[in-house]
């Protein structure tokens, strides 16, 4: 499960985060095709107009939209970035945890991979699809929660490898200044040996 109900668990009141659809990541092509077939057997249909390559939109008779993701985002213009994201997306299948959400155990990414999916989702919307405040709110409540240091380090290693630390740092600085993000929780991402951050802006 990506975003949605999983991300809502970080909000002080889960219902504050409106979920427009259900996002499920299945990067393996055979499993992806099987998932589509299973959903169709249960009356879920593929929507007539598809707006993206990285997911297939389906809906049931009640109008609930399910997005089956074969990737975290559309392809970017940099092939090296795409290859790294694809690598980490495939690794997500073995970096899962069970979250109890409203009494149900749901498979969600481990913290580092959840953070990565949120970061890539923001980057996708920033570059391709329009950027909304909801993305920043998700990012703030996620990082205002307590997380394991080793998972934080894993996340930072991944975004460094992909080459998007600059984007993530810019988002963090905006969120600290305007949206109440806890600076101490993300300072490891906004200052390193290559970057001097003027803390007066906070």
Predicted segments with their positions:
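Conserved NTP-donor binding/palm subdomain of two-metal-ion nucleotidyltransferases/polymerases, i.e.
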Residues: 1-20, 26-202
